[in-house]
From Swiss-Prot:
InterPro entries: Cyt_b/b6_C (IPR005798), Cyt_b/b6_C_sf (IPR036150), Cyt_b/b6_N (IPR005797), Cytb/b6-like_sf (IPR027387), Cytochrome_b (IPR030689), Cytochrome_b_C_euk/bac (IPR048260), Cytochrome_b_N_euk/bac (IPR048259), Di-haem_cyt_TM (IPR016174)
Residues that hold heme b b562 according to the record: H83, H182
Gene3D superfamilies associated with the record: Cytochrome Bc1 Complex, Chain C
Gene field: MT-CYB
Superkingdom to which the source organism belongs: Eukaryota
Name of this chain's protein: Cytochrome b
A Pfam family recorded for this sequence: Cytochrom_B_C
Organism of provenance: Ochotona himalayana (Himalayan pika)
């Protein structure tokens, strides 16, 4: 009798994705972040669902409903802080996952890579709208500043902003629609994840060497199920440590002040995971130019398969490209730091130089270094 997991229509899909999936035998811990992102998405959907049961999306009661969750709901405080810090974990895993894709040349699977970029945009949109919901000072002013950027679009900009606001300023209509979108987007993300995996399983996983590994594959279960479980335990431990010991470490104290349209906070800044993009936005004096640079800071990832000039896929054996990759990482950390600083000397010039270097590295230096490495290897 054939095993049910190989014959049943539904079990067969699960079996081919998680059990009998042929997997390269040498993939390292950097390949753990895909499953960790799945775990983060699951945590966010479950905690978010319970928060939505108690939250009210009205400007008069939103702030107090979040306070009510923390004070009066059974274990509401842990649900709220797991959701808030879960977002930070989500982005840590996202950045590491994308970084791994760049380092090991996984972007050559262009369909998987492009769906991944769509996912990144969707998660960023979800996180932005989620940050508006507690209706604190930074929620309100963050929403005002970021939605206002759309007014830079020629001709339709102003109408577009008012259409998104549902009025002449960020108000009740804006909060209600942001809550609706924040609720639905994670499910759209989950569907996109399925498409992401569908395309990945068409080709199979890449591996650290970047060489086709068809000759040396092992089943996903038990080898990588065990490995992923270890990753889950480490991620949950880190998340719980953050939630239980320092839940407000990554938040902004201004968000504990209810939203007040008449009082602007001294420094409007987004959550830490958007600071690099915010620094790029601020480094260009022109409004439309800044908005374009902001979008391109993520969209530039789509150009990676086109800019790949090396004869090797992975950076594992390419020291010049490795050096440039780590300079890019340092540059992104610099941008993250600059995004949290006030707009004054010397931060302005540092931000402009770091923004220029970010695009210059990806568009010019990395493709040239690959060509040099080809020459050195007489290819």
């Amino acid at each position: 009798m054939t095993n049910i997991r190989k014959t049943h229509p539904l079990m067969k899909i699960i079996n081919h994705s998680l059990i009998d999936l042929p997997t390269p035998s040498n993939i390292s811990a950097w390949w753990n972040f895909g499953s960790l992102l799945g775990l983060c998405l699951g945590i966010q959907i479950i905690t978010g669902l319970f928060l939505a049961m108690h939250y009210t999306s009205d400007t008069l009661t939103a702030f107090s409903s979040v306070t009510h969750i923390c004070r009066d709901v059974n274990y509401g405080w842990i649900i709220r802080y797991m959701h808030a810090n879960g977002a930070s974990m989500f982005f840590i895993c996202l950045f590491l996952h994308v970084g791994r894709g760049i380092y090991y040349g996984s972007y050559t699977y262009s369909e998987t890579w492009n769906i991944g970029i769509l996912l990144l945009f969707a998660v960023m949109a979800t996180a932005f709208m989620g940050y508006v919901l507690p209706w604190g000072q930074m929620s309100f002013w963050g929403a005002t500043v970021i939605t206002n950027l759309l007014s830079a679009i020629p001709y339709i900009g102003t109408d577009l902003v008012q259409w998104i606001w549902g009025g002449f300023s960020v108000d009740k209509a804006t909060l209600t629609r942001f809550f609706a979108f924040h609720f639905i987007l994670p499910f759209i993300i989950a569907a996109l994840v399925m498409v992401h995996l569908l395309f990945l399983h068409e080709t199979g996983s890449n591996n650290p060497t970047g060489i086709i590994s068809d000759a040396d594959k092992i089943p996903f279960h038990p080898y990588y199920t065990i490995k992923d479980t270890l990753g889950f335990l480490l991620l949950i431990s880190l998340l719980l440590a953050l939630v239980l010991f320092s839940p407000d470490l990554l938040g902004d104290p201004d968000n504990y002040t209810p939203a007040n349209p008449l009082n602007t906070p001294p420094h409007i800044k987004p959550e830490w995971y958007f600071l690099f993009a915010y620094a790029i936005l601020r480094s260009i004096p022109n409004k439309l130019g800044g908005v374009l640079a902001l979008v391109l800071s993520i969209a530039i990832l789509a150009a990676m398969p086109l800019l790949h000039t090396s004869k090797q896929r992975s950076m594992m054996f390419r020291p010049i490209s490795q050096t440039l990759f780590w300079i890019l990482v340092a540059d992104l950390l610099t941008l993250t730091w600059i995004g949290g600083q006030p707009v004054e000397h010397p931060f302005i010039i540092i931000g402009q130089l770091a923004s220029f270097l970010y695009f210059f590295l990806i568009l010019v230096l990395m493709p040239i270094s690959s060509l040099i490495e080809n020459k050195l290897l007489k290819w």
